[in-house]
């Protein structure tokens, strides 16, 4: 059995907010597997234990650029160390230029994007200059280019959430409404086909374990799990979500009423999946005093 260290318990505690002893028990039961331990705690404490999955820590900006005909666009995320840098005029101008370059040139990857020419040099040149000027690390993290089947529509919320939607049919207002909905509801995919099988299976396992602990009959477990999975899919797939401006209809119903469909969408949330290192100032001072 893998050794359960204090740092492992601390990490699981930070991920889930579960009591320390429960974290240790879960890690022991999972034989040190952090993901499995988190799943065990979800069974015991509900979805609160999965809070780390949506925790966002890094700073930066998301920007979108769409060509005039609405047929080609890009969304980019560029990270900085602090929100102060993310509000810097030079930094914001750089992000906008990178988004425009991505939409124009359609680079294959971040390395190719970094080599593109913008005002004053390559993306990498300007990034390096900004680091020297502002004094913070700046990273071109990710981007996506969309060639539309319909027409591209975007929504950016405070530079922190960006959405790019390929809307077939409908009008600009419908597109904006759906893009804003995506930013608010944060669907994982357009429909159930885009949800990874392992994620669905994890939901089934959790549902079955919770049903067992609640004393439900063995014969009912599969039915309960099926219901839980269907509820989960309705919550995380765009077409099944209730429209945020009118929850009496789903996005799918809204689209049908407007003779429209969505070919694809991309959503970026600044820092999604990045954990910022948080310094314990008191511990740092104490450690320094021992030197």
UniProtKB/Swiss-Prot annotation:
GO terms for cellular component: cytoplasm. Keywords: Cytoplasm, Elongation factor, Protein biosynthesis. Residues 82-85 are annotated as: Involved in Mg(2+) ion dislocation from EF-Tu. CDD domains: UBA_EF-Ts. The keyword Cytoplasm applies. It is found in: Cytoplasm. The keyword NADP does not apply. GO terms for molecular function: translation elongation factor activity. Gene3D superfamilies: 1.10.286.20, DNA helicase RuvA subunit, C-terminal domain (1.10.8.10), Elongation factor Ts, dimerisation domain (3.30.479.20). It comes from the Bacteria. Belongs to the EF-Ts family. Associates with the EF-Tu.GDP complex and induces the exchange of GDP to GTP. It remains bound to the aminoacyl-tRNA.EF-Tu.GTP complex up to the GTP hydrolysis stage on the ribosome. HAMAP family: EF_Ts. This is Elongation factor Ts. It comes from Methylobacillus flagellatus (strain ATCC 51484 / DSM 6875 / VKM B-1610 / KT). The lineage of its organism: Bacteria, Pseudomonadati, Pseudomonadota, Betaproteobacteria, Nitrosomonadales.
């Amino acid at each position: 059995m893998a050794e359960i260290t204090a740092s492992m318990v601390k990490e699981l505690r930070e991920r889930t907010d579960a009591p320390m002893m429960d974290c240790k028990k879960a890690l022991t039961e999972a034989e040190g597997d952090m993901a499995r331990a988190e799943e065990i705690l979800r069974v015991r404490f509900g979805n609160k234990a999965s809070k780390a999955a949506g925790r966002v820590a890094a700073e930066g900006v998301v920007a979108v650029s769409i060509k005039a005909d609405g047929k080609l666009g890009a969304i980019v995320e560029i990270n900085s160390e602090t929100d102060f840098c993310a509000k810097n005029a030079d930094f914001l101008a750089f992000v906008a230029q990178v988004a425009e370059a991505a939409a124009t040139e359609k680079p294959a990857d971040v390395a190719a994007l970094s080599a593109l020419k913008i005002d004053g040099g390559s993306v990498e040149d300007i990034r390096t200059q900004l680091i020297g000027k502002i004094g913070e690390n700046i990273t071109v993290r990710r981007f996506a280019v969309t060639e539309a089947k319909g027409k591209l529509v975007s929504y950016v919320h405070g530079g922190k959430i960006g959405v790019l939607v390929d809307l077939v049919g409908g009008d600009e207002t419908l597109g904006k409404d759906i893009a804003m909905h995506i930013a608010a509801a944060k669907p994982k995919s357009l429909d159930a086909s885009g949800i990874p099988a392992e994620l669905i299976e994890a939901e089934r396992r959790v549902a079955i374990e919770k049903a067992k602990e609640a004393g439900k009959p063995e014969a009912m477990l599969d039915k309960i799990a099926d219901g839980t999975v269907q509820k989960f899919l309705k919550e995380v797939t765009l077409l099944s979500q209730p429209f945020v401006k009118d929850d009496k209809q789903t996005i799918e119903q809204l689209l049908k009423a407007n003779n429209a469909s969505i070919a694809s969408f991309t959503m970026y949330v600044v820092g999604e999946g990045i954990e910022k290192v948080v310094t314990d100032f008191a511990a740092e001072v104490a450690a320094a005093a021992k030197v």
